[in-house]
Amino acid sequence: MKVYLVVVDTLADWEIGYLTAELHSRRFFADPSKDFQLLKAGVSRDAVTSMGGVTHTPDLAIDDIQMGDNDLLLLPGADIWESAQARPALELARNALDHGHQVAAICGATVGLASIGALNTRRHTSNDLGFLKASCPDYRGEHMYRKEPAVRGDNLVTATGLAPLEFSYEVLKMLKVWKPETAKAWYRLHKTRQERWYHELVASMSDTPAVLS
């Protein structure tokens, strides 16, 4: 399994922080030995700078991505999603969705998907429905819009930029790399900050391995 994180200038660090930390560390994986890679993909192999000033050097170019059955294309928020620079990533995302591959997009990346009509027939959310309708001429997906922090469909997760925790939770469930009880405890711990969920998270790691359904 590979997760391809699209890295671009102005990438919104906080929107993917929970998710990339857990995927890279594998600390709560049901099977830590699982064949898994988190790869950074750029428009080119040139380094980019995130909104927080962090430099990212892509492992490969977007044009070189070959999506496998269980792979995920991860699109973080950034200021570039309505520009020509974003087109290669958006076209890859649309093609991936059409072929049943997994895609996750948050904040501005959802606007990019809406702008090419990729959300018209798929359940989704974004920062604001009115903005999608006003700024994306090819958007016809109002009937599929859900006013929720994050929405998971068959092979697509979308989220508002204000919900990085919910976004991460839905993506991790879609990838099925954690046990259900691990995912629940992890999410509730971060959401409520209650001690009981820390103990449940620890306890979940001592049980027989299972995967999310």
Language-model features, listed with the residues they occupy:
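Active-site-adjacent pocket-lining segments in enzyme domains
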Residues: 2-6, 10-12, 18, 25-44, ...
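Short gly/ser/thr-rich secondary-structure transition/capping motifs
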Residues: 52-59
